[in-house]
């Protein structure tokens, strides 16, 4: 199993705070992708945060129900790993053939991975020659706690599915949203319910990957308190009007402006 790569016929699963999403595509990176299957199911966050066997069973039933709803037949699955559970960095190592790079990265990883290398699942991708030193290669290094990765895989495989890949959500976001061939600097942001992932792109590759606490829920609370409205109303205002200054007399914009 690879942390970064999925191959063959498969579908992808993303378990969020209050929903699950799954998608199956056809095609390839060169010719383009086509959406084949898709499912979105709201989930009580008490279930997604419940690590008990009962909670896992309920979540598993929802996942299988969503798969059936989407009409997905393949059992091969790629799972998104939350950014807060992964560590991603760009490092530079002496340029060398792939086999030697593998050994070098394993050695160098100990300096970057915020856990014991023996307790981590580590994968990497070669981005190319370093713009700072032609004798070095730029490496996208990604890691997660091995016990966590194995726990997630075990829970999913108990549903009769075959995990072929686990990928950090920020990296999946880059592959899905980053424009192909764009070389200038771009920032891609994913505003989640309780945290926000951001990736800075340059010359077609991620250069900075971060997950920061605070997400949509923080905005909802701010608007709720400022406009004296219910939680569901505040959420609707934000999703419908955003930061538009000409909507709702600019009240949502003003509430979030100085947050």
How should each PLM-predicted stretch be described?
Residues 13-20, 82-84, 188-196, 201-205, ...:
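A short acidic Gly-Thr/Ser loop motif
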Residues 1-108, 150-152, 160, 184:
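Non-catalytic, solvent-exposed interaction/assembly segments
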Residues 36, 207-209:
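A structural motif specific to WD40 beta-propellers
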Residues 101, 229-237:
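Small-residue helix-packing motif on alpha-helices
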Residues 234-259:
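Adenine-nucleotide phosphate-binding core of ATP-dependent small-molecule kinases
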Residues 76-179:
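Active-site neighborhood for divalent-cation/phosphate handling
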């Amino acid at each position: 199993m690879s942390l970064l790569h999925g191959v063959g016929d498969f579908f992808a699963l993303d378990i969020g705070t209050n929903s699950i999403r799954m998608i199956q595509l056809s095609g390839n990176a060169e010719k383009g992708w086509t959406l084949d299957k898709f499912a979105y199911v709201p989930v009580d966050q008490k279930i997604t945060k419940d690590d008990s066997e009962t909670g896992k069973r309920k979540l598993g039933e929802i996942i299988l129900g969503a798969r059936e709803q989407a009409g997905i037949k393949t059992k091969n699955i790629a799972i998104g790993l939350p950014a807060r559970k992964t560590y991603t960095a760009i490092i530079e190592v002496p340029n060398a053939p792939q086999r030697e790079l593998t050994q070098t990265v394993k050695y160098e990883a100990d300096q970057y991975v915020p856990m014991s290398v023996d307790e981590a699942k580590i994968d990497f991708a070669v981005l190319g020659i370093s713009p700072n030193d032609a004798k070095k290669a730029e490496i996208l290094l990604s890691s997660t706690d091995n016990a966590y990765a194995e726990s997630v895989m075990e829970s999913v495989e108990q549903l009769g599915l075959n995990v072929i890949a686990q990928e950090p959500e920020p990296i999946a976001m880059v592959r899905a949203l980053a424009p192909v061939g764009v070389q200038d600097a771009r920032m891609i942001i994913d505003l989640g319910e309780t945290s926000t992932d951001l990736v800075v792109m340059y010359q077609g590759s991620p250069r900075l990957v971060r997950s920061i606490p605070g997400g949509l829920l923080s905005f909802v609370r701010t608007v709720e308190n400022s406009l004296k409205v219910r939680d569901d109303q505040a959420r609707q205002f934000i999703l419908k009007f955003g930061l538009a200054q000409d909507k709702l007399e600019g009240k949502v914009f003003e509430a979030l402006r100085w947050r």
